[in-house]
Regions:
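Short S/T/G/P-rich N-terminal loop/turn motif that feeds into the first structured element of a domain
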Residues: 1-66, 86-101
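Conserved short beta-strand edge segments in small beta-sheet-based binding/regulatory domains
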Residues: 72-88
Length: 101
């Protein structure tokens, strides 16, 4: 299963978010997921960033709690928001319906 973090912040907070991100990205992540990203795009409202986490089976809850704690450190940034979304592969989604390819 994948988790995707979608972050948003105003352009004026980019330096603050960037410094925090550098500190966090330098830390050794848990061994139960692989991170891809971050990727960023710029909108009229500011910056939108995406990080994708490929989570080991059975560790989804642990990964979600860990990421929630990580992203909570950004709450001091004015205008910052994050949504952590659960993404299923087509095989995982079909399995929920009792189907398979």
């Amino acid at each position: 299963m994948f988790l995707m973090a979608v972050q948003r912040w105003p352009m004026s907070a980019s330096e603050q978010v960037g410094k925090m991100a550098v500190d966090l990205l330098r830390k050794t992540p848990p061994d139960y997921y692989k991170r891809t990203g971050p990727f960023a795009t710029f909108t009229e409202e500011g910056v939108k960033s995406y990080l994708l986490y490929d989570v080991d089976d059975g560790r989804e809850g642990e990964a979600y709690r860990y990421l929630t704690d990580v992203y909570a450190t950004y709450r001091a940034v004015e205008g910052y928001s994050v949504v952590i979304e659960t993404l299923l592969s087509i095989d995982e989604a079909l399995a929920l319906l009792g189907l398979k390819l």
